[in-house]
């Protein structure tokens, strides 16, 4: 999945 730049998937 694609995550917005600047946010970490955590």
Curated annotation (Swiss-Prot):
It is found in: Secreted. This is Gonadoliberin-1. The gene is gnrh1. GO terms for molecular function: hormone activity. The keyword Nucleotide-binding does not apply. The modification Glycine amide is found at residue 10. Pfam families: GnRH. Belongs to the GnRH family. It comes from the Eukaryota. It comes from Clupea pallasii. Keywords: Amidation, Hormone, Pyrrolidone carboxylic acid, Secreted. One of its GO terms (cellular component) is extracellular region. The modification Pyrrolidone carboxylic acid is found at residue 1. InterPro entries: GnRH. The lineage of its organism: Eukaryota, Metazoa, Chordata, Craniata, Vertebrata. Stimulates the secretion of gonadotropins.
